[in-house]
Curated annotation (Swiss-Prot):
Cell compartments where the protein resides: Secreted; Host nucleus
Keyword Secreted attributed: yes
Polar residues bias locations: 361-377
Superkingdom assignment: Eukaryota
Source organism per UniProt: Plasmopara viticola
Residue interval(s) of motif RxLR-dEER: 56-71
Keyword Signal: yes
Keywords, sorted A to Z: Host nucleus, Secreted, Signal, Virulence
Protein name, UniProt field: Secreted RxLR effector protein 142
Function: Secreted effector that completely suppresses the host cell death induced by cell death-inducing proteins.
Region (Disordered): 48-73, 354-377
């Protein structure tokens, strides 16, 4: 606008110079319109009283003097320095008679009036140098503007006693310069909870905080500004401080606690016992004995019943531990240079069998014992993982019922003895043998089938005063002799019927069922079963009775 005004003045000066010579100053001509002189007077008044505002165009040559009063061009007095020049312009204007020149002056006057009516709000003063980003006026005229200092990073570094600004300080200063929605606080204090009109003051935060509150996409890198209240901002920051790594929660899926509750209900009747720690040579698969023995439950049986006479049967047993190097131990006891395929098959089955305990009654889901505790049923290794709260959702694979093919106490002792091997003459199946045999079967879920005459032979061996240990060569030689006495393949197959697949293998990898392999399989089975029977007897020495003092063997296959 001011450029147009000065252009009009320049035109007036040029026109006045041409017409001044032809007209006299004291003889004004009669204009066709009386409004021309009024327009010149208006221009004169505006030149003397108009206060120019700050120019937004940095190319303007006029400099503004800052102060509490309205700003005026400092070079205006120099521009209109000589009164004679102003009088010559007015005189020349009065002498103009053309309608076009009058319209130009009238347009310049209107422009000055428009500048006067559109005065902008003065800019607030700052103590520091203001950055190039000028604050925009707020729609609310009662709220003052906030200016941003150029040296914000340096001031932050000085406040935190750092030598130079860090990257975080630079980012904060950059955000302050780019932010156009900040409201200056009414005082030097921090942000108030309530504004004068009772509404919450809004502070700009990012969508990141809102997503953190919802626990959604906490690691995404995009940002979006959104207005939230101060109270909500404080709550979000408190929640962030409580948990530096919030956990993503899927509300559409079932929680882990609900799954664990279902698992507990499903396993309520088949609760498991925690697996006992083992030594270095133990694979960690154990067998738990039932907390109450079935033999103890038949104390009121008739006196002629053999089982009814075992009122003092062992009530509990320690877990059965399985050694890692079973093939090597078997090779040493049988004087072999290296383990055979049958020894490896037997060791593989022992590690997979886990020797689950016998159930407390006809039902696999036992009730409570006499002391009020639950009957513990050993399940697979998956149950141990459930106890550690691992994979709580895979409930279907966490439990296995007690083996239904477990060997039980024979109802017809004569028939069971007839199916067994031909032992020595001094290994008769008497009442004592039946008592120990029944307790042995009920206390443990045996890996291989045990005949009563085999128990009779082992009971005689364990009572030897010398050379009774499982690692003794004499015991192994006795088992070899028993196996060599059976020279018929069909007879050996009948004896090993329940255990043929365990020892000789199954399918395409099965060993041929010839006499040599069948005899070796019987020897390996007897060696393993005697190792377990020896420790059973010394674990319950009072129940078995008449046992000599023998030190515990150094090497073992199964251990209580």
């Amino acid at each position: 606008m001011r450029r147009a005004y000065f252009v009009a003045i320049a035109l007036l000066v040029a026109a006045g110079g041409k017409t001044a010579a032809g007209f006299k100053h004291n003889e004004p001509l009669h204009a066709s319109s009386s409004n021309f002189m009024a327009s010149v007077d208006t221009v004169d008044e505006d030149l003397q009283s108009q206060n120019l505002q700050e120019s937004r165009d940095p190319k303007d040559d006029l400099k503004l003097s800052a102060g509490n009063e309205e700003r005026t061009p400092s070079a205006l007095n120099n521009f209109l320095k000589e009164p004679k020049l102003l009088e010559s312009i007015i005189t020349a204007g009065k002498a103009m008679r053309t309608e076009g020149e009058a319209n130009a002056i009238e347009a310049a006057s209107k422009n000055l009036n428009q500048i006067e009516s559109n005065k902008r709000q003065r800019i607030a003063l700052t103590h520091n140098a203001v950055a190039g980003h000028r604050g925009h006026p707020s729609p609310d005229s009662d709220k003052s503007l906030m200016s941003v200092a150029n040296e914000n990073p340096l001031m932050l570094a000085e406040s935190l006693k750092d030598q130079r600004p860090t990257a975080i300080m630079e980012n904060a200063a950059s955000l302050l310069k780019e932010h156009d929605y900040r409201l200056a606080p009414p005082e030097s204090s921090t942000i108030n909870d309530k504004a004068p009109d009772g509404r919450l003051k809004n502070q700009v935060v990012t969508q990141k905080a809102v997503q953190l509150d919802k626990n959604e996409h906490v690691d995404e890198s995009f940002w979006r500004e959104e207005l939230v209240s101060v109270d909500q901002l404080m709550r979000l920051l408190d929640e962030f401080d409580k948990s530096a790594h919030p956990t993503t929660v899927n509300r559409h899926e079932e929680s882990a606690s609900a799954v664990a509750l279902k698992s507990s209900n499903q396993l309520e009747s088949i609760t498991h016992q925690r697996i006992a720690p083992t030594s270095n040579n133990v694979i960690g698969q154990v067998a738990h004995a039932p907390s109450n023995n079935v033999i103890g439950q038949v104390a009121h049986a008739p006196s002629n019943n053999v089982i009814g006479q075992v009122a003092h049967a062992p009530s509990s047993l320690s877990p059965v531990l399985v050694a890692k190097n079973i093939p090597s131990i078997l090779a040493d006891r049988l004087m072999k240079k290296r383990p055979t395929a049958i020894m490896k098959n037997a060791a593989r089955y022992l590690t997979q069998h886990i020797n689950r305990p016998a159930p407390s009654g006809p039902s696999t889901n036992g009730a409570t014992t006499s002391n009020g505790g639950l009957n513990n049923q050993l399940t697979s290794q998956k149950t141990f993982q459930l106890d550690q709260n691992k994979h709580v959702g895979d409930v279907k694979t966490f439990w296995l019922p007690t083996a239904v093919d477990r060997q039980s106490v024979p109802e017809d002792w004569a028939d069971e003895v007839a199916k067994g091997p031909d032992t020595f003459s001094n290994d008769a199946v008497n009442d004592e043998v039946k008592r120990v045999h029944a307790a042995f079967l009920e206390a443990l879920n045996l890996p291989f089938h045990q005949y009563p005459q085999e128990t009779a032979m082992m009971l005689r061996m364990v009572r030897w005063k010398k050379n009774a240990g499982p690692n003794n060569d004499i015991t192994s030689a006795l088992f070899k002799t028993l196996a060599k006495d059976h020279e018929e393949v069909l007879r050996l197959q009948d004896l090993l019927g329940p255990d043929l697949k365990k020892l000789l293998g199954d399918g395409k990898m099965a060993l041929p069922r010839n006499l040599k392999n069948l005899q070796e399989a019987l020897i390996v089975k007897l060696v393993i079963m005697y190792d377990l029977f020896f420790r059973f007897c010394y674990k319950h020495e009072d129940f078995v009775g008449d046992l000599p003092h023998n030190p515990s063997p150094a090497s073992w296959i199964l251990k209580l």
